[in-house]
Every structure is written in structure tokens, then in C-alpha cells.
From Swiss-Prot:
Cross-link Cyclopeptide (Gly-Asp) residue location(s): G1-D30
Tissue expression per record: Detected in stems (at protein level).
Lineage: Eukaryota, Viridiplantae, Streptophyta, Embryophyta, Tracheophyta
Organism field: Pigea enneasperma (Spade flower)
Protein name: Cyclotide hyen-G
SUPFAM superfamilies recorded: Cyclotides
Keyword Disulfide bond set for record: yes
InterPro entries given in the database record: Cyclotide, Cyclotide_bracelet_CS, Cyclotide_sf
């Protein structure tokens, strides 16, 4: 539920290594 300050509209979340995932074109963590 916390935004990771990254979008995933065109490319995947680089912050997935930090536990972030793509949701509604924005990377979130929990």
C-alpha cells in the first residue's frame, strides 16, 4: 500500500527487488 515513487506504465517496477509490485500503473509496497 505504500507508493514506491515509480510508475510501471511502460516498463516493470525496478523496485520489485525492494518488495514493490505494480498496481494501477504505479509501484506499491504493501
Amino acid at each position: 500500500g505504500l507508493p514506491c515513487g515509480e510508475s510501471c506504465v511502460y516498463i516493470p517496477c525496478i523496485s520489485t527487488v525492494l518488495g514493490c509490485s505494480c498496481s494501477n500503473k504505479v509501484c506499491y509496497r504493501d
